[in-house]
Amino acid sequence: MAIKIMIADDHSMIREGLKSLLELEGDIQVVAEAEDGVDCLEKLKICTPDVLLLDINMPRKNGLEVLQTLKSSKSKIKVLVLTVHNEV
């Protein structure tokens, strides 16, 4: 049975790149993508992935706020936090 993954990141190029890499594996299926935290939580109402790849820095609702919502709802979804931090 395939592992169901959702990708939540505000950069479409990152979502597409992760999806392409993950789908090279035969036992992984990307079941949903979200462009921000609000979109992520809405899609989680209709889709239950095994794993959520979650960016921290997103508009409207950031990844930490999404994590708090998942924690308060006692979600069983495993979350892997991915983020980019640029230093000058």
For the regions a protein language model found, what residue spans apply to each?
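Short hydrophobic/Thr-rich beta-strand motif most characteristic of the beta2 strand and flanking loop
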Residues: D27-E35, K43
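Active-site residues of response regulator receiver
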Residues: D9, D55, T83
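Acidic catalytic/metal-coordinating carboxylates
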Residues: D36-D39, N62-E65, N86
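Receiver (REC) domain active-site loop signature in two-component systems and cognate sites
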Residues: M58
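Conserved sequence signature across two-component system core domains
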Residues: A8-D9, A34, L52
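A short, hydrophobic beta-strand element within the central beta-sheet of small alpha/beta folds
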Residues: K76-N86
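Active-site beta3 strand of CheY-like receiver
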Residues: C47-L53
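Short amphipathic alpha-helix used as the core "switch/output" element in two-component signaling
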Residues: E42, L64-K76
